[in-house]
Amino acid sequence: AGDAMQPTSLLLSLRDAGFEMNDDLTKLYLDYCKERSTISMNSQDWTLPEPTRAAYTDDMLNTATAFSDTAVVVIGRSGGENADLPTDMNAVIHGTYDVAKTDVVDTKYKGNYGYTAGTYTNNGDYDDFEPGEHYLELSRTEEDLVDMVCSNFRNVIVVINANNAMELDWVDKYDNIGAVLLVPGTGTTGMTALGKILSGAVNPSGKTVDTYLKDLTKAPTYNHSGNSGNHIYTETDDLVKKVGRNDLSFQGVFTFTDYVEGIYMGYKFYETAAEEGLIDYNEYVQYPFGYGLSYTSFTQKITDFKQNDDSLTVEVTVKNTGDVEGKD
């Protein structure tokens, strides 16, 4: 736990690391969204505040590109306990998102949004998401932002500030995106590391703890997890009344998830399915479990292998083959 009300900001992290930033762009972002949308146990505003393409004038872009040929794009997502990520953002926008499927729930619960009601406010005069697009995809406004930045800056760094594994297939569409940094929940002081990493003072050594897919909707768990796979508890009338009296955000539905996949989730499914010829691994997986780059390179060599009944022991020698210190 930490004091989330006074965290180290991204701007402070960059300044402390010696970076200078474009004042016009900084002011644009700070003025556009002085207060962030809230996603909590009792309130779920899934809005992704982002200035539209029209907010970036020609003069602003000309000044920015003259200032530097390098740009940092930050994409953020939230979510957490009692805030399962929506699988149809367009429906959230229009207030019709119904996680209580009509074929598995009594009609008196139809239309309820899980435990709490969810909302979304568009950034422009268009819908940020098309029907069926989920929360871990880029919004239309974010797509416009990435395209604009990559069309104007030679070097682009993408920072993903999200605890959940987003769809990042769009990264491969732009040759000038030279780096993607995964920066999940930073707590009070975690963001201080970002500036140090970007400046080269610190060599990153983190690895992905999830499998990053090119299309999350093709994951076996997609239709059985979170709001998309909710089953509804029955015989809960007494509990519904008690909770409803104490929690005004309660919508009258208690849900659960059926873990039908067993152990075959994440890398266990994709590596097994590829080995058995069910899928082409590279068509599904963008970044595998345990993936991560640094400012140096390594080689690994198995130097010993032992099997003892039902246990295996493998010894690996790791060698830094690059020019700077690092960890692997």
Question: Language model features by range: what are they?
Answer:
Residues 1-328:
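C-terminal non-catalytic regions of proteins with extracellular/luminal or membrane-system context
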